[in-house]
Amino acid sequence: MAELATIARPYAEALFKASLSDLNGAAVWVEELETIAKNPQLLQFADNPNVTAAQVYELIAGIAQGALPAMAQNFLRTVIENGRLSALPEIAAQFRVMKNAQSGSSDAVVYSAFAIDSTALAELAATLEQRFARKLNVSVQLQPELIGGIRVVVGDEVLDSSVKARLEQMKMALTA
């Protein structure tokens, strides 16, 4: 079977080209469809041979917050009819990468042991943008196992200033 990234690439490229006039608008509904498509029960329903593509489409359209734009409807129908619903999260990820490349920004995930308030997050985002020398779309995910501090992932770069990482470094130094 082909890799999911290989399957998703033509869909992401076509979606990107078709939505160049409104990338931000498309990003909103692509993200929503991605979230919906990650549901294992939905994927199981869609894989049922007794369920039609129209039924899957109606279910997803019904779950979506508000009405989907015409482009989103056409895109979703195409993905479902081609049996690629399970590839939708990867399509969305590749679309996001293309959108970020177009705008000169990157996604940054900040893993934190504790919740970060909006003021601190804004300051952190500004600092990270200087550190990584580009505009960042920052999101936060809680990871209590970090004990304290943060771990930032921007593309393939990782900045880890968590207590857990420091303890691991100390452990390595002591056992070396």
Curated annotation (Swiss-Prot):
UniProt topology in membrane: Peripheral membrane protein
Subcellular location(s) of the protein: Cell inner membrane
Pfam family, one: OSCP
Highest rank taxon of the organism: Bacteria
GO cellular component: plasma membrane; proton-transporting ATP synthase complex
Gene3D superfamilies given in the database record: N-terminal domain of the delta subunit of the F1F0-ATP synthase
Keyword match Transport: yes
Sample GO molecular function, one term: proton-transporting ATP synthase activity, rotational mechanism
Stored InterPro entries: ATP_synth_OSCP/delta_N_sf (IPR026015), ATPase_OSCP/dsu (IPR000711)
Keyword entries, A-Z: ATP synthesis, Cell inner membrane, Cell membrane, CF(1), Hydrogen ion transport, Ion transport, Membrane, Transport
UniProt keyword annotation of Nucleotidyltransferase present: no
Family: Belongs to the ATPase delta chain family.
Function: F(1)F(0) ATP synthase produces ATP from ADP in the presence of a proton or sodium gradient. F-type ATPases consist of two structural domains, F(1) containing the extramembraneous catalytic core and F(0) containing the membrane proton channel, linked together by a central stalk and a peripheral stalk. During catalysis, ATP synthesis in the catalytic domain of F(1) is coupled via a rotary mechanism of the central stalk subunits to proton translocation.
Subunit-level organization: F-type ATPases have 2 components, F(1) - the catalytic core - and F(0) - the membrane proton channel. F(1) has five subunits: alpha(3), beta(3), gamma(1), delta(1), epsilon(1). F(0) has three main subunits: a(1), b(2) and c(10-14). The alpha and beta chains form an alternating ring which encloses part of the gamma chain. F(1) is attached to F(0) by a central stalk formed by the gamma and epsilon chains, while a peripheral stalk is formed by the delta and b chains.
Name the UniProt record assigns to this protein: ATP synthase subunit delta
UniProt organism field: Albidiferax ferrireducens (strain ATCC BAA-621 / DSM 15236 / T118)
Source species taxonomy: Bacteria, Pseudomonadati, Pseudomonadota, Betaproteobacteria, Burkholderiales
